[in-house]
């Protein structure tokens, strides 16, 4: 059998608790757990772990750099722009139309909202920057939403997501019992 140890990285002695551990099963979500930080710490400690490596985790959490990488290898991605307090709000709406505004390095749709005017874009920016230093406005793409998990070199079957919300937000992901998966 296996001996399992639960370790909370919020505790100051979490690294010391890992002494003698042969494998870490990472069950953390969001910044600090999915962004390469924990993966890097475990790698530094010489402890093998489950899931993606440091670089893959860091890129997956960073929407801006992921999109730049995809563009660099010729993959299609929705148009986007990094927002700052001095952004040309109306110019962005004129260029993209409706956009989704999101923290660049956050998950679970936290801090994410839509905007279809200069005023709502500015408000969405203020909301998103509460959760991350970098904020993106991404062009709205109309159509069904799918998710596909990749395990090793294999893509698992796609899942179509349906929600009564405007988009697959935090509520639809974790709270609502009305979200449908096909």
Q: Where on the chain are the PLM-derived regions?
A:
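Active-site nucleotide/adenylate-binding loops and adjacent lid/helix of ATP-dependent enzymes
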Residues: 4, 15-19, 59-144
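Short hydrophobic/aromatic-enriched beta-strand-loop microsegments
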Residues: 48-52, 77, 157-158
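Phosphate-binding site of ATP-dependent enzymes
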Residues: 116-182
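ATP-binding N-terminal substructure of ATP-dependent carboxylate-amine bond-forming enzymes
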Residues: 1-55, 59-65, 72, 84-91
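Short glycine-/acidic-enriched loop or helix-start segments at secondary-structure transitions
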Residues: 35-37, 110-111, 147
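Glycine-rich phosphate/pyrophosphate-binding beta-alpha loops
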Residues: 30, 109, 164-167
């Amino acid at each position: 059998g296996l001996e399992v140890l639960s370790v909370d990285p919020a505790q100051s002695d979490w690294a010391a608790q890992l002494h003698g551990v042969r494998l870490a099963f990472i069950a953390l979500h969001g910044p600090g757990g999915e962004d390469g930080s924990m993966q890097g710490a475990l790698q530094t400690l010489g402890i093998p772990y489950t899931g993606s490596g440091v670089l893959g985790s860091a890129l997956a959490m960073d929407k801006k750099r992921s999109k730049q990488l995809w563009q660099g290898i010729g993959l299609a991605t929705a148009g986007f722009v990094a927002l700052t307090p001095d952004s040309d709000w109306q110019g962005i709406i004129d260029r993209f139309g409706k956009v989704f505004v999101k923290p660049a390095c956050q998950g679970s749709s936290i801090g994410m909202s839509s905007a279809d005017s200069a005023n709502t874009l500015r408000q969405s920016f203020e909301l998103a920057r509460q959760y991350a230093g970098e904020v993106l406005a991404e062009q709205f793409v109309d159509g069904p939403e799918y998710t596909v998990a990749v395990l090793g070199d294999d893509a698992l079957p796609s899942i179509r997501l349906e929600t009564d919300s405007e988009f697959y937000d935090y509520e639809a992901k974790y709270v609502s019992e009305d979200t449908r998966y096909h």
